From Swiss-Prot:
Belongs to the metallothionein superfamily. Type 15 family. This is Metallothionein-like protein type 2. The lineage of its organism: Eukaryota, Viridiplantae, Streptophyta, Embryophyta, Tracheophyta. Keywords: Metal-binding, Metal-thiolate cluster. GO terms for molecular function: metal ion binding. Pfam families: Metallothio_2 (PF01439).
Length: 78
């Protein structure tokens, strides 16, 4: 997920935006990766693309709060 280009910016109303690159929503994906090999079995349903997810989440400002140094705390824009 992301908001406004992947950044939670600290704007005047402490909303999602690109005011400053406080926290990137896509960094959470790195935690799901591991160094071991994994096998994925895909079903018959088409895989949802990342662009669709970005479009769905773009422009949303729920749950984005400003912390110190113009960072988001927590960075959980929905």
């Amino acid at each position: 997920m992301s908001c406004s280009g992947g950044n939670c910016g600290c704007g005047s109303s402490c909303s999602c935006g690109s005011g400053c690159g406080g926290c990137r929503m896509l960094t959470d994906l790195g935690e799901e990766r591991s160094s071991t090999s994994q096998t994925m079995i895909m079903g018959v349903a088409p895989q949802k693309g990342h662009f669709e997810e970005l479009e769905t989440a773009a422009g949303s400002d729920n749950g984005c709060k400003c912390g110190s140094n113009c960072t988001c705390d927590p960075c959980n824009c929905k």
